[in-house]
Structure formats: C-alpha cells, structure tokens
Amino acid sequence: MIKIKDVEKSYQSAHVFKRRRTPIVKGVSFECPIGATIAIIGESGSGKSTLSRMILGIEKPDKGCVTLNDQPMHKKKVRRHQIGAVFQDYTSSLHPFQTVREILFEVMCQCDGQPKEVMEVQAITLLEEVGLSKAYMDKYPNMLSGGEAQRVAIARAICINPKYILFDEAISSLDMSIQTQILDLLIHLRETRQLSYIFITHDIQAATYLCDQLIIFKNGKIEEQIPTSALHKSDNAYTRELIEKQLSF
C-alpha cells in the first residue's frame, strides 16, 4: 500500500529581497491500496505535480511521509520494481537518441540483466501488449505520434512489472479520440496485470472514465475525496464548480 501522511512541501522564493518559502503542498493525507485506481484532480498550479514527485520518491517532503508497504518511498530500493510512471511530456522518459528497442532494453538490463535474445522477445511482447507492432523497435521517439510515444512510455513503465503506475497528465496533450484509446488500454492493462493507478489530471471526464476514487485538489490541499459513483451528488462548492466547467450531468 502507498500511504501519504501529513505531507507538506514548500519552495524558497527566487525574489532577491523576499527569501521566504512558499507552501505548495499543505498537509495532504490519503492511501492507495493494491487494486485501487485513484485520480488526483486539480487545476494548473494546484500543486499536484509537486505531490506526484513526492509520491514517486523524486523529492522528499518537508514534513510528513510517503511510504510503500511502510517503507520510505524516497529510498530507491523501496520503490524499485514497485512503481512506474508516465508523464505528459514523453521526452521525460524516452531518450531522443535511443530507439524504442534501446529504451526498453535499458530498463530490462537494470531489472533482470537477461540475454539480448530474451530481451528482444520480451520487448516485442511488451509493444504488442500496448498495441504496437515489432516494426516500432527500430524507431526513435521523434518518429512517433503523440499517442504512439505514450504507448511506448506505458510499455516502459510496465516493463518492470510494477504494482503501481503513476500518470502525471499523461494524456492531456493528446487528441480526444487518442485519449479514449489510451484510457481503454489502461483499463485493459489494469485488469490483465492487476495494476493500481494514481492518475493525476485536470480532466474530470478522463478521471471518471478510468478511476473509482477521486481526490479533488485545490491550492495544495485535498478539497474532497469521493467515490466516482457519488461525484454527481457532491455538495462541495469547488467540486461543483469543476463539474460545471467540464461536465454536464
């Protein structure tokens, strides 16, 4: 289980004469058990990407803790093989001068160190699992469409056989039709691989399509946590505002 408990994070102002710290994440707590699919929904600047970096162990919280099976997430040995990530900008995870084969091999070597012949078969199988043929093995990221690149990023994330995958605005730059295809792929992978998701987004519609629990995030705090099935019954003013902006029931 991933636990986020009383997490706080602030950054020092870059202003020369005002060296005070600005709080970005403020006392956030929630849990993501095995089998859960949780969306963190917030507008731009709400602090959700800072929260995602702490969940991934890339940054340590100033206060509170993020743990995986009661072990601190910022320790590589704790999160290794346990959590994958897919970001909005695929260049964050796909090296521009590596082929798809090399991108997947690099992760496989870190995990298992299998012979190349074995990794070749595994890589082709991974691509097929995300809806790409083996013809993509020799392509570079700049030869891929946005949807194809995200499929490769997803293949890279599942390559380590994780229990969890965190998605940080992973589909927001894609066309609507491609977004739906990727969401359907994520639903399929969740079922076939028994994956748990933390899905960080500004898009309520995508969140409700994929996730069974919603966390509404505002100004670095949890405004509301609610089952997807109960969203239309929410009486929280900010949640209603987001719904009215994006959805019509």
Curated annotation (Swiss-Prot):
CDD domains: ABC_NikE_OppD_transporters (cd03257). GO terms for cellular component: plasma membrane. GO terms for molecular function: ATP binding; ATP hydrolysis activity. ATP binds at residues 42-49. It is a peripheral membrane protein. Coiled coil: none annotated. It comes from the Bacteria. Its main location: membrane. Keywords: ATP-binding, Cell membrane, Cobalt, Cobalt transport, Ion transport, Membrane, Nickel, Nickel transport, Nucleotide-binding, Translocase, Transport, Zinc, Zinc transport. It is an enzyme of class 7 (translocase). Nickel/cobalt import is reduced in the presence of zinc. Its EC number is 7.2.2.-. Residues 2-244 form the ABC transporter domain. The keyword Ion transport applies. It is found in: Cell membrane. Gene3D superfamilies: P-loop containing nucleotide triphosphate hydrolases. GO terms for biological process: cobalt ion transport; nickel cation transport; zinc ion transport. Disruption phenotype: Deletion of the cntABCDF genes decreases nickel and cobalt intracellular levels and decreases virulence. Insertion mutant shows attenuated growth in several infection models. Part of the ABC transporter complex CntABCDF (Opp1) involved in the uptake of metal in complex with the metallophore staphylopine (StP). Involved in the import of divalent metals ions such as nickel, cobalt and zinc. Probably responsible for energy coupling to the transport system. Plays a major role in nickel/cobalt import in zinc-depleted conditions. Contributes to virulence. Required for full urease activity in vitro. Belongs to the ABC transporter superfamily. The complex is composed of two ATP-binding proteins (CntD and CntF), two transmembrane proteins (CntB and CntC) and a solute-binding protein (CntA). This is Metal-staphylopine import system ATP-binding protein CntF. It comes from Staphylococcus aureus (strain NCTC 8325 / PS 47).
